[in-house]
């Protein structure tokens, strides 16, 4: 693993200030970690075209390097994610830093999906569990709940953005 090249990919822009300390620790541990953002090469006007329409049921939330939170249509973003991952094919591992459900949409042999890891980890710890989940946006409730219900969990969802924290959202 020491000689492995690891790509950490955010669906927003890199570098992500909120992940900088963790990434620095990986580098200090001898790992060859590189950061990439799916939106890195896109102009603000192009990013705006990726906003969800009222018909979009699968919404993703991420950060730009200026700290701005953006809402994105997963369907509109998918070609950009696929291109970014294709460009990184020389990396030993690619970690997509998004908990959206991409298992049926992305099939790269070296791709690590936190969504798949989290649902299987929790399922491995306890097979019948009611769980509370916090997501960035209220309109993510349906897709988040469906994902965890497929893994046979009873889900309660609340929205509070990690990028625009508001304690009132959690009350």
Outline where the language-model segments fall:
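N-terminal glycine-rich anion-binding loop in soluble enzyme alpha/beta folds
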Residues: 2-71, 135-166
């Amino acid at each position: 693993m020491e000689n492995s090249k690891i790509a950490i990919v955010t669906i927003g822009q890199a570098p992500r200030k909120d992940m900088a300390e963790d990434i620095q620790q990986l580098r200090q541990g001898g790992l060859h970690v590189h950061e990439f953002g799916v939106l890195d090469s896109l102009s603000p006007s192009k990013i705006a075209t990726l906003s969800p329409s009222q018909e979009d049921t699968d919404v993703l939330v991420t950060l730009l390097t200026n700290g701005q939170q953006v809402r994105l249509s997963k369907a509109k973003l998918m070609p950009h994610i696929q291109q970014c991952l294709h460009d990184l094919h020389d990396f030993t591992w690619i970690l997509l830093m998004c908990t959206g459900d991409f298992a049926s949409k992305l099939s790269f042999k070296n791709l690590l999906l936190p969504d798949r890891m989290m649902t299987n980890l929790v399922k491995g710890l306890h097979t019948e569990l009611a769980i509370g989940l916090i997501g960035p946006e209220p309109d993510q409730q349906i897709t988040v709940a469906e994902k965890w219900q497929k893994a046979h969990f009873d889900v309660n969802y609340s929205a509070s953005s990690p990028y625009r924290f508001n304690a009132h959202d959690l009350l």
